[in-house]
Amino acid sequence: MAAVRVFCVLLVVATIAARRTAGGAPATSDTGDQALPAVTAPPESAHLDPFYKKYIEADGFPIVASAGVSDYALREAAYLAHMMLANRPDVRRAMVQSGSRLCIMAHNEFTTDLPEFAWLAKQKEQDFPDLAAKDYWDARARGCGGDEEHAHCSCGEENLLGYEGDPYAAENILIHEFAHNIHLRGVVRIDTTFDPRLKEAFKQAMAAGLWKGKYASVNHHEYFAEGVQSWFDNNRENDHDHNHVNTRAELIEYDPALADFCREVFGDTQLTYTKPVTRLKDHLSGYDPAQAPKFVWPERLHEAKRQIRRHAEARGRVKADQPATGAPAKGT
């Protein structure tokens, strides 16, 4: 978009087997679960909006939610955040120092309901002149990653816990959005060469015809976040936003430069995704999927969803017809 650049998905907890981290120590599911504190009320020191009633930390990284969000969603989010940055406490510290936090939407809450993203309700998207800004953003995003100016990221509880009706059931939104936050609130504060190097890799990938017409071709930020999803074996494949690449092995073969950036940031820690229903133990012990609510798009957003999907499909058709020289990135 032109005036507003908060990275949101258009549209992933993990079973962690014992792996070797970049430092040689095993990263295990037990390690992740033992690191999780209890869900509590937000501490006064967090200075949160009264909207938030629940709070947890992943190694000091704050995760917040309203009273309507399941405690299990907060614990799952903390688990994933802990494991993704198992090798990079320095990046996590930089994110926290920048003011970053993760905000979880209840299944019946939407992006502009969150205090950190309420301002989007007044930010008209120029490609959708017939849509109210609030409807556009509420239909467009079940997760946002933040950027250099906006510290916060978000995701929906229905995706974290695998509720019926989850519109993005084939992937984990937290992994994508947290990747943006790791990039733009963490890594770039530690290594000022990272973003210029990533931009150059993106430019070369576009010149080589990689990711043509797919979401990874939108800009270098989405290029990285989509790569991170595949690095953790968690992406959709073969639809209007994705090609066949959805695993680490496929990413290494298809775009080794992007894989190298993922390795640089995350090392060899691996998340092997399975739905919560397959692993009701440890931090999910006691969770009963049969009692979970269903996610339903409200009627007020149906037209916005139709227009957004048509736009995404048209983007894919146009870019697929363009020469493999790249095009100006249009960020979201």
Predicted regions and their residues:
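N-terminal mature-domain "stem" immediately C-terminal to a signal peptide or N-terminal signal-anchor/transmembrane
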Residues: 26-79
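Acidic/His-rich structured neighborhood in mature extracellular/periplasmic domains
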Residues: 51, 58-61, 69-209, 241-244
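Pan-zinc metallopeptidase signature
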Residues: 228-332
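Bacterial N-terminal signal peptides that target proteins for export
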Residues: 1-7
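Bacterial N-terminal signal peptides
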Residues: 7-15
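Ser/Thr/Asn(+Pro)-rich, low-complexity disordered segments
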Residues: 47-48, 54-55, 198-201, 311, ...
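Bacterial Sec-dependent signal peptides at the C-terminal "C-region" and cleavage site
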Residues: 15-31
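An amphipathic alpha-helical core segment
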Residues: 194-251
